Amino acid sequence: MIGKDYFCKNYFNMDLSKILSISGKPGLFKLVGEAKSNIIVESLIDGKKIPAFSHERISSLHEISIYTHGEDLPLYEVLKNLYTLQQGKAVDNPKKMDGKSLKSLFEQVAPDFDEEAVYASDMKKVFTWYNLLLEKDLLDFSEEDENNSTEPTEEEGVEPEK
C-alpha cells in the first residue's frame, strides 16, 4: 500500500517535505543544505540563509496534520481545499481576522476539525503559510499525467492494494 508520504510528494507536483516550520521563527523555510550539526535553511520571507540546529523544533510541512474528530487531516489536503475554495487566490489578511471568521473559513477547508485541539492561532498560521506558499509559487495541485506517473510498481517493492 502506498503511504501518505508518497502521496504528498508524487500525487501533486509539489514537495512539502523540504518546506519547514521552525518554532519561534516567523514564516517558513526551505531546506537548502546539511552540515554536521545543523541544517541550512532559507527564509521564504526574506531569502536569508541561516543555520537551524537539532535542539530547535523543526517540522516539515508534509508531517503536519490537523486534528479532527476522526483521522487527522494532512496539511497538504487542507492547503488543497483552501486553494480550491479561494480559486487560487490569497486569503485576505488572516492576522486581522476575528475568531468567528477564522473558524468559518477553517470549517470549509477542514470540516471535521477538532475545535478543542485546533486554536485560532493554528488557523491563522495555516492561512498565513498558505499565502506565503502561494506568493512564492510553491503550491501546485495539478495532478501528474498518468503516462508520466512516478508511482512505483510491484517490481519496485510496492504491493498492490487488496
Provide a role label for each language-model segment.
Residues 91, 95, 99, 103-117, ...:
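Conserved interaction-surface patches within small, structured recognition/assembly domains
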